[in-house]
């Protein structure tokens, strides 16, 4: 896999069931969740020792943004570390609630929709060169992203006036534009707001907001890995057929509602194509591209899972990937439960099952239970995730940020940090600007730490 700075931002759903008479609003529950963070960070928007950012987003949604990663397994470990960091906050908040006489269980969900129909996102970030034609890259990537849900969707039981049906994606029905500078109002596929968090003369950040939040480590590997490969092909000028859809927003919904992948979707230039055929062509192009430029173990793993997932959809024999792809894992679970208990998809217990798959609490969330029983495949170990909770990626700028935050906290020093700045809030107001996200060592940061 080409070395590239990548990151994942995840907004979590939160709710609380109360045991006593007193009730709290979602806003109040979220504030309890972040009380420990505010006590040491004096804010609900902080950077952690592992280089990540943790904050309370609009609408009472806790959000975790991984540190800059340049390898997929490291990114997956840091994405999973975010779940555990927030789960630790949940345990702390439940203890505080109990101490104050407000008995309650807090539920944190790594999903994309709530029961009221609200949607919250999972955003992928890829660093690209400033010199490239952004519009060309975005236009080339959108058809891939529209069809990618076939291999990387989280799955959802969609309730409608016509009944209930199983869909590929949680996010698809909440996307309203192809490209836009807004993320909450219009919910585009690619966000065009130009915030590189790096040297603006050299870099730009590609901000993809169409993807689902994945519980499965292997699905995250496939989701991000395939996007990185297609992006690399576009940047390298690999000729690809024009799959621009006549209406990308209608296309993303039609594809989500068809688990066979065979729904023909209209193309802007005339004719049509199915998600299965489009993804198969992307896969074949990527396999040829990698064969020509050379492979590595991670790229091989991505291509192998991509091929096997497409074969599973083609044959509708999902046993080849039913521990590796979120929407398939969940569908197998729901189908088995519904058949055992004689339920249809409209039954409330099916909705509960759908939601509980995304509960991040170990031993309660269904995905974590499946993983513990070997029925959900892994990419990284529990030890790697535990390490990622406190140790930043060692080959990117995140290492400098994480080491600075740790040193300042240990020394009891007042400091300010963002993605590119490290600042000691003392009389000298010493500040270091880190414009190169690939750089993991810097004498200026070493001196700043030594001066504490």
UniProtKB/Swiss-Prot annotation:
Class of this enzyme: ligase
Pfam families hit by this protein: Pup_ligase (PF03136)
Pathway(s) served: Protein degradation; proteasomal Pup-dependent pathway; Protein modification; protein pupylation
Underlying gene: pafA
Domain of life of the native organism: Bacteria
EC code: 6.3.1.19
Further remark: The reaction mechanism probably proceeds via the activation of Pup by phosphorylation of its C-terminal glutamate, which is then subject to nucleophilic attack by the substrate lysine, resulting in an isopeptide bond and the release of phosphate as a good leaving group.
Active site (UniProt): 57
Residues at which Mg(2+) binds: 9, 55, 63
Species of the source: Nakamurella multipartita (strain ATCC 700099 / DSM 44233 / CIP 104796 / JCM 9543 / NBRC 105858 / Y-104)
Protein name as annotated: Pup--protein ligase
PANTHER family tied to this protein: PUP DEAMIDASE/DEPUPYLASE, PUP--PROTEIN LIGASE
Stated family: Belongs to the Pup ligase/Pup deamidase family. Pup-conjugating enzyme subfamily.
Classification via NCBIfam families: pupylate_PafA
GO biological process: modification-dependent protein catabolic process; proteasomal protein catabolic process; protein pupylation
